[in-house]
Curated annotation (Swiss-Prot):
It is found in: Cellular thylakoid membrane. This is C-phycocyanin alpha subunit. It comes from the Bacteria. The keyword Lyase does not apply. (2R,3E)-phycocyanobilin binds at residue 84. Its main location: membrane. The keyword Cytoplasm does not apply.
Length: 162
């Protein structure tokens, strides 16, 4: 899995050199931000269920047809609602993985690579998940550097869906 740290090490190793001062400063900066990232990951994990439930409700309010139309991709049945919550949870989990890893590697490898194919195969609208992620971003309760770190990965997911 790629992270800024592993990429810097791989580049230096490929070139048979030590890390440059610039690369070392970047790694040092990452370690300083790691405390805030871990705080954010813990908070998102501890509040995951309420964030997921709230995000699902935000989707249903913005796109009310999702709760009335029939089909496995809609939330008109308890099973459909459970699938919606599961999918929102997957996006939130990816954000926490990125926070722990310190880069977008987990999202790039486990989510974005097949995102458009999954959405088209199952007739899922990216706008549903964008709305869910916007809700999570607006309601996660994080402040300071922890919010900055979490919001960066939430925005990354939103941009990937756009």
């Amino acid at each position: 899995m790629k992270t800024p740290i592993t990429e810097a090490i791989a580049a230096a190793d490929t070139q048979g050199r030590f890390l440059s001062n610039t690369e070392l400063q970047a790694v040092d900066g990452r370690f300083k931000r790691a405390v805030a990232s871990m705080e954010a990951a813990r908070a998102l994990t501890n509040n995951a269920q309420s964030l997921i439930d709230g995000a699902a409700q935000a989707v249903y309010q913005k796109f009310p047809y999702t709760t009335t139309m029939q089909g496995s991709q809609y939330a008109s049945t308890p099973e459909g609602k459970a699938k919606c919550a599961r999918d929102i949870g997957y996006y939130l989990r990816m954000v926490t993985y990125c926070l722990v890893a310190g880069g977008t590697g987990p999202m790039d490898e486990y989510l974005i690579a097949g995102l458009s194919e999954i959405n088209s195969t199952f007739d899922l609208s990216p706008s549903w998940y964008i709305e869910a992620l916007k809700y999570i971003k607006a309601n996660h309760g994080l402040t300071g550097q922890a919010a900055v770190e979490a919001n960066a990965y939430i925005d990354y997911a939103i941009n990937a869906l756009s």
